[in-house]
Regions:
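Short beta-strand motif characteristic of blades in beta-propeller domains
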Residues: 83-84, 244-254, 292-297, 344-347, ...
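Surface-exposed loop/turn elements that mediate protein-protein interactions on large endomembrane-trafficking
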Residues: 54-57, 92-105, 257-274, 303-320, ...
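Beta-sheet repeat architectures centered on beta-propellers
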Residues: 1-87, 123, 130, 140, ...
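A short beta-strand motif characteristic of beta-propeller blades
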Residues: 230-232, 270-277, 320-326, 370
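Loop/turn segments within WD40 beta-propeller blades
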Residues: 288-289, 336-340
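Short secondary-structure subsegments characteristic of cysteine-rich extracellular domains
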Residues: 316-338
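Internal metal/ion-chelating core segments
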Residues: 271-313
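Disordered, low-complexity "stalk" and linker segments at domain junctions of extracellular
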Residues: 2-34, 52-257, 262, 268-274, ...
């Protein structure tokens, strides 16, 4: 007698005849989390994507799809903004409006390219001072950019009118609405100081509309505003990609070729060059987990500390994983994923998990050999993490691998199951729902009204060729049972409504058999025997599988 009292997933790298006792040769669309066979619910259509969509992002109940590879970063909640790279040739910030509508602006505030021209009546004397002017741009969010180069100096008496011209208007994509004008002012001294210290700053003269072509400055020095603070501000690199938010820090991050860039904390438009980090390899993917930044490259992976207390780049710790694990993905938006355990991405040997302490693990090595892995086109991988499962889709196969059984009280541990879905992209919502983009439709996984039909086929059950099973018993609420011989022929099939034993037809002698289940009902237990009365009286004195 062969008894199946628990059910596992497939292990492609292991020959059928050497599979562990609970493993399967086919486990397709089946739920194994509770130690028995159960059906997932069908997907639920929850939205329509743009034509030829390649990615999808959720923000609360709002979703956004794009026909190119676009990355989106959420930011501090009360800012009411989202940040994007890949939609245009430059990074963007979007203001969230009514009904999820987005108004896009180019991220950053540019430095003016023109130098102001100043004119007025020059004077000399104790009440006169030499001054020069600069100006900055201010955008719709009140963010200010770096100043222009200073104008030529002019010496005038305090309060004398100075005409200022030469303002230029930046590209409309920046959303600049105003100009700040600054002029130099020197602190007053009595003249009897032992050490002469002259403090000269640019102080605010006036904020004017962006459309202003000229301005007359006759403001007294005592009425000037605050000193300029944006001398070292820099807009993000034009080719920035993979924008992410380091949660809890107020810092955005993104990459170019082999450089990692950071914004100043709570200044998302200011990407000062002092924060730039250069790595020795080309960057492929990045992910964030809290204030940790994970970086995969075409060489070694890295973990970077992006904590809020870190100001200059020297303070950001960079840890290298001292094993070459090149990321081979071809640049899909979902070709890496952040999980509670770290970042997962695709290498030539399998899925790599890099933990926050810069340790790594090949999490698919127990299921896929390197040769098996290469066959499924891992360079085309799309990944998601959902309730303890890693969902992996390639151009060849889609599967789910459980990596966190403890949190979700799984009785059987990690299992690998193939899926019918062929998503172009995947994402998870803030409420933890898995969304698949397929056929320009957004599908919510495991949310439909009906159940999905599954197939599960056991390992080879060895009867030694000396006997043939004549009866079967399945504890189920309704499932189709099939028996497959050693020639891979389906020699018996029948719908079984309950656990009443059934008789099998004459099957002939084979060395082994595989028991298969198809349908939507649950299966707690199954047994193959050679005597009907043994199963009828539930005398399970055979080999437990």
């Amino acid at each position: 007698m062969a008894i199946l009292s628990s059910f596992g997933g497939i292990i492609p790298r292991v020959a059928w005849h050497t599979l562990p006792l609970t493993s399967a040769t086919v486990a397709h669309d089946v739920k194994l989390r509770n130690g028995k066979l159960e059906a997932w619910r069908e997907r639920l259509a929850v939205g329509t994507a743009t034509t030829d969509a390649k990615c999808v992002w959720y923000h609360g109940c709002c979703y956004y799809t794009f026909d190119k590879c676009v990355d989106m970063a959420e930011y501090v909640t009360d800012y009411g903004r989202l940040y994007f790279t890949g939609r245009e040739d430059y990074p963007e910030v979007a203001k969230i409006g009514d009904n999820c509508a987005l108004t896009y602006y180019r991220l950053g505030v540019p430095k003016p390219t023109s130098v102001l021209t100043v004119s007025g009546t020059s004077s000399t004397g104790r009440n006169c001072a030499s001054r020069s002017y600069v100006y900055t741009y201010v955008n719709v969010f009140g963010e200010e950019g770096a100043p222009s180069l200073p104008s030529e100096s002019i010496t005038v008496a305090d309060g004398t009118a100075v005409t200022i011209t030469g303002f230029t208007i930046p590209d409309a994509t920046y959303g600049v609405t105003a100009i700040n004008i600054y002029r130099t002012a020197t602190s007053w001294t009595e003249g009897n100081e032992k050490v002469q210290e002259t403090n000269t700053d640019y102080l605010l003269v006036e904020t004017i509309p962006i459309s202003t072509s000229s301005y007359i400055d006759n403001i007294l020095e005592k009425n000037l505003g605050e000193a300029i603070t944006t001398e070292y501000n820099r807009e993000p690199p034009e080719n920035l990609r993979e924008i992410r938010y380091l949660r809890g820090t107020g810092v955005l991050t993104g990459v170019t070729t082999n450089q990692v860039h950071f914004s100043k904390a709570y200044q998302p438009s200011n990407w000062s060059s002092e924060y730039d980090l250069t790595l020795p390899y080309n960057i492929v993917n990045i992910q964030t987990l809290g204030n940790k930044l994970f970086v995969s490259t075409d060489g070694y992976p890295y973990v970077i500390d992006g904590a809020q207390k870190c100001e200059p780049r020297q303070c950001r710790g960079v840890s290298e994983v001292f094993t070459p694990l090149p990321d081979i993905s071809c640049g899909h938006v979902n070709s890496s994923v952040a999980t509670p355990f770290g970042m997962i991405y695709s290498s030539k040997d399998g899925l790599v998990l890099v933990s926050p302490d810069a340790k790594f693990q090949l999490i698919t090595s127990a299921w896929f050999s390197t040769d098996d892995w290469i066959k499924i086109r891992p360079d085309t991988v799309r990944l998601a993490y959902w309730r303890g499962y890693v969902i992996c889709a390639t151009d060849v196969i889609t599967f789910m691998l459980e990596i966190d059984s403890g949190v979700y009280n799984d009785a059987t541990g990690a299992n690998l199951v193939t899926l019918s879905d062929e998503p172009v992209a995947l994402t998870t919502t803030q409420s933890g729902e898995l969304i698949m983009l397929e056929g320009n439709i957004l599908w919510q996984w495991n949310a439909g009204k009906s159940f999905r039909k599954y197939i599960w086929t056991s390992r080879e059950l060895n009867f030694g060729g000396e006997s043939t099973p004549t009866t079967a018993k399945v504890r189920t609420d309704g499932i189709t049972v099939s028996l497959i011989d050693s020639d891979n022929s389906h020699v018996f099939e029948r719908f079984v409504p309950d656990e009443t034993p059934i008789r099998l037809k004459r099957l002939g002698r084979h060395r082994n058999w595989r028991l298969s289940f198809t349908g939507t009902g649950s299966v707690d237990y199954a047994a193959l025997g050679i005597r009907y009365d043994t199963l009828e009286r539930n005398k399970l004195n055979g080999t437990k599988i």
